């Protein structure tokens, strides 16, 4: 008679974050057992679970933000970038995002169907862009400009997946300070991603000045390779016309702040986001200088426009009025910064078309916000069907927090813990 089989030791949740880090294998086993079970979008998610999930999103995008900032500076110094530290940071963040999207797709926690589809479309676009970018390098040689189609796919995919994360958190987090802080963090990453293409000119204008002064930080092989590709130093460091930087800053980045201000709802949302972003860039500037990497110009004019955005939304000004005021003040602030310091090349004649275009975009946003589509967007889509009392992933009674109904933003979505496989 064979000896009785000993039962497998129970896998318990770590008692603290320190214990979780001390025993990572046990942590993974516990997470896999309790949370990697099939479920539909809208699955019951407690407040604590929601905070942990979206904290992981914040960490992932923090890695991507630091990596991308360093990567731009890296490409103004070195030609080689295989296994470069900024690429490794960015890749670590991307790997975390892939894991999170797989988790949401399989388990259904913390997202509705629309948020999940945005996350999936975003990471899919990003991953498809990687081989396209590699092929672009093989066919066209050196391509460090952030304005190339393959690079545009990368930050477009990032924007789409961030939109999904913003939606998921805003739908299911209970109103309060935690909801506002995490939302501000996600919107900060969205703003940084929107501003990312403009960094080429912001690094390039200083690198070109150093080159002309005979003090370039770029290695000779980088400049030689650029010349072999038929590019002059000016074309290499400032690859787009001088109307592009102001047009993108106003029509894309300020519009991002308008949407963030409307969604988050705090009075100084746009100002806080712009100031935090500029503070981050200032710290990065100092660290890059210490490390011998090229620094960049800071787009301080963004802060002036952000203040006007907050005031215009608070005063309930029509979009065409707010757009003219915010765009005009941004151009005036840029002119002052140009007189006192340095900015990338701006075509000042573009002020009229850019400000008018921004006013039209803001007015269109006002109209969209009043539409039936916008009203339907605020409600969760295709939640998991209710099936009795809420339970967690292993059938225990779930710690369901109180909150608004599932049809309202901020709902925690109380549904059955175990959902059928999709």
Model segments located where?
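N-terminal signal-anchor module of multipass membrane proteins
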Residues: 2-99, 366
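Non-cytosolic membrane-interface motifs at loop->transmembrane helix junctions
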Residues: 80-88, 141-152, 294-296, 345-352
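Aromatic-anchored segments of alpha-helical transmembrane domains
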Residues: 63-68, 124-134, 188-199, 273-286, ...
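Short, highly charged, low-complexity non-transmembrane loops/tails of multi-pass membrane proteins
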Residues: 372-404, 408-421
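Hydrophobic cores of alpha-helical transmembrane segments in multi-pass inner/ER membrane proteins
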Residues: 88-105, 153-169, 244-258, 299-312, ...
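Membrane-interfacial loop-to-transmembrane alpha-helix junctions, especially the N-terminal start
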Residues: 49-62, 109-125, 175-187, 263-274, ...
């Amino acid at each position: 008679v064979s000896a009785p089989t000993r039962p497998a030791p129970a896998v318990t949740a770590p008692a603290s974050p320190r214990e979780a880090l001390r025993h990572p294998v046990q942590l993974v086993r516990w997470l896999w057992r309790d949370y990697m079970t099939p479920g539909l979008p809208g699955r019951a998610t407690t407040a604590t679970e929601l905070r942990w999930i979206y904290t992981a999103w914040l960490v992932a995008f923090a890695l991507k933000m630091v990596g991308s900032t360093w990567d731009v500076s890296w490409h103004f110094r070195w030609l080689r970038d295989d296994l470069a530290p900024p690429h490794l940071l960015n890749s670590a963040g991307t790997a975390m995002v892939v894991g999170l999207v797989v988790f949401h797709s399989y388990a259904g926690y913390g997202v509705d169907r629309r948020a999940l589809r945005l996350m999936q479309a975003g990471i899919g676009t990003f991953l498809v862009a990687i081989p396209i970018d590699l092929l672009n390098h093989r066919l066209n040689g050196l391509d460090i400009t952030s304005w190339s189609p393959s690079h545009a796919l990368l930050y477009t995919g990032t924007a789409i997946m961030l939109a999904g994360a913003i939606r998921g958190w805003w739908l299911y987090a209970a109103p309060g300070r935690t909801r506002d802080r995490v939302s501000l963090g996600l919107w900060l990453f969205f703003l940084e991603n929107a501003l990312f293409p403009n960094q080429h000119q912001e690094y390039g204008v200083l690198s070109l000045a150093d080159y002309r002064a005979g003090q370039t930080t770029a290695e000779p092989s980088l400049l030689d390779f650029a010349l072999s590709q038929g590019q002059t130093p000016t074309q290499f460091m400032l690859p787009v016309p001088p109307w592009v930087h102001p047009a993108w800053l106003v029509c894309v980045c300020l519009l991002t702040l308008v949407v963030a201000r409307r969604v988050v709802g705090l009075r100084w949302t746009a100002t806080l986001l712009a100031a935090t972003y500029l503070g981050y860039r200032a710290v990065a500037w100092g660290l890059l200088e210490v490390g011998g990497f090229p620094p960049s110009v800071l787009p301080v004019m963004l802060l002036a426009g952000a203040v006007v955005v907050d005031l215009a939304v608070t005063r309930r000004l029509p979009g065409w009025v707010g757009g003219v005021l915010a765009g005009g003040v941004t151009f005036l602030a840029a002119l002052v910064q140009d007189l006192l310091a340095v900015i990338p090349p701006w075509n000042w004649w573009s002020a009229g078309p850019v400000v008018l275009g921004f006013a039209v975009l803001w007015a269109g946003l006002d109209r969209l916000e009043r539409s039936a589509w916008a009203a339907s967007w605020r409600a969760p889509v295709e939640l998991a069907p209710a099936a009795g009392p809420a339970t967690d992933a292993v059938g225990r009674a779930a710690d369901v927090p109180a909150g608004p109904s599932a049809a309202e933003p901020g709902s925690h979505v109380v549904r059955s813990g175990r959902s059928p496989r999709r």
